[in-house]
Swiss-Prot record:
The active site is at 264 (glycyl thioester intermediate). The keyword Cytoplasm applies. E2 conjugating enzyme that catalyzes the covalent conjugation of the C-terminal Gly of ATG8-like proteins (GABARAP, GABARAPL1, GABARAPL2 or MAP1LC3A) to the amino group of phosphatidylethanolamine (PE)-containing lipids in the membrane resulting in membrane-bound ATG8-like proteins which is one of the key steps in the development of autophagic isolation membranes during autophagosome formation. Cycles back and forth between binding to ATG7 for loading with the ATG8-like proteins and binding to E3 enzyme, composed of ATG12, ATG5 and ATG16L1 to promote ATG8-like proteins lipidation. A motif (Caspase cleavage motif LETD) lies at residues 166-169. This is Ubiquitin-like-conjugating enzyme ATG3. It comes from the Eukaryota. Homdimer. Interacts with ATG7; this interaction forms an E1-E2 complex that is essential for the transfer of GABARAP thioester from ATG7 to ATG3 and disrupts interaction with the E3 enzyme complex. Interacts with ATG12; this interaction is ATG7-dependent, essential for phosphatidylethanolamine (PE)-conjugated ATG8-like proteins formation and also mediates the autoconjugation of ATG12 on ATG3. Interacts with FNBP1L. One of its GO terms (biological process) is macroautophagy. Residues 140-170 are annotated as: Interaction with ATG12. There is a cross-link at residue 243 (Glycyl lysine isopeptide (Lys-Gly) (interchain with G-Cter in ATG12)). The lineage of its organism: Eukaryota, Metazoa, Chordata, Craniata, Vertebrata.
């Protein structure tokens, strides 16, 4: 039944997107949405700092006139996925469905019981090293640094702007050498762990209706054979399957359909992050959008080790 509902919603949104005019004036600071030009600028910034991501065109007949022909969407391929979501430690007590009647089946607050007051106070005490802009260190340089801490759990989308990830503490902001750590875990797991290794192709498109980026993914087994929908769902947080994540056709590529992270809350989350940075005396540039976007959607696909900024300082 949920699949039928998602299909109907998908068709309705296709019509709505077609009828929605292209956003011309920047509303990033006010609402968290971006124009196609800002999407391209953020994409260029992502490609520069994380070169595993590249621009692509897709099918000629599906080219969107409001985007440059050679910059229709972003793609990164052969992204490793070393384990299934069910293999990760999980506790129902740490999650709660929020806004169950919002029309999308409810959203998951991953760290519901971790102490909201403490988190809020931590965000209020943010100190910014630079009040003019955000400084970013290149991913390729930081990949070579020695790691002394264990991997941290993925932050949920609504938790991100409150969790302290915006603090200037480098130990907090420095996401770990994820790929190497996961490889080590796979090696330690023996032959069974190796056989479970999958890869994913990830895509970021511009959603004209929601006026935000949208993430797509398609998976393959260890023989590079396409995964079934049910197999891909194994690599997605089960509380987001068929709610936040649905199966839809890629707007620039031919079938088969792909998993897509629904963008209905992206602007809202980004707006909160912008406000948090501003309260600390800083300014979040729109060029940082995709780097932060990839961080907060990690909660949905926690076992897929894609490339995003490893360190940024407010």
């Amino acid at each position: 039944m949920q699949n039928v509902i998602n299909t109907v919603k998908g068709k309705a949104l296709e019509v709505a997107e077609y009828l929605t005019p292209v956003l011309k004036e920047s509303k990033f600071k006010e609402t968290g949405v971006i124009t196609p030009e800002e999407f391209v600028a953020a994409g260029d910034h992502l490609v520069h700092h994380c070169p595993t991501w590249q621009w692509a065109t897709g099918e000629e007949l599906k080219v969107k006139a409001y985007l440059p022909t050679g910059k229709q969407f972003l793609v990164t391929k052969n992204v490793p996925c070393y384990k299934r979501c069910k293999q990760m430690e999980y506790s129902d007590e740490l999650e709660a469905i929020i806004e169950e009647d919002d029309g999308d089946g409810g959203w998951v607050d991953t760290y519901h019981n971790t102490g909201i007051t403490g988190i809020t106070e931590a965000v209020k005490e943010i100190t910014l090293e630079s009040k003019d802009s955000i400084k970013l260190q290149d991913c390729s340089v930081l990949c070579d640094e020695e790691e002394e801490e264990e991997e941290g759990e993925a932050a949920d989308m609504e938790e991100y702007e409150e969790s302290g990830l915006l603090e200037t503490d480098e130990a907090t902001l420095d996401t770990r050498r994820i790929v190497e750590a996961c490889k080590a875990k796979a090696d330690a797991g023996g032959e069974d762990a190796i056989l479970q290794t999958r890869t994913y192709d990830l895509y970021i498109t511009y959603d004209k209706y929601y006026q935000t980026p949208r993430l797509w993914l398609f998976g393959y087994d260890e023989q590079r054979q396409p995964l079934t929908v049910e197999h891909m769902y194994e690599d997605i947080s089960q509380d987001h399957v068929k709610k936040t994540v649905t199966i839809e056709n890629h707007p620039h590529l031919p079938p088969p359909p792909m998993c897509s992270v629904h963008p209905c809350r992206h602007a809202e989350v980004m707006k909160k992050i912008i406000e948090t940075v501003a309260e600390g005396g800083g300014e979040l540039g729109v060029h940082m959008y995709l780097l932060i976007f990839l961080k907060f959607v990690q909660a949905v696909i926690p076992t897929i080790e894609y490339d995003y900024t490893r360190h940024f300082t407010m």
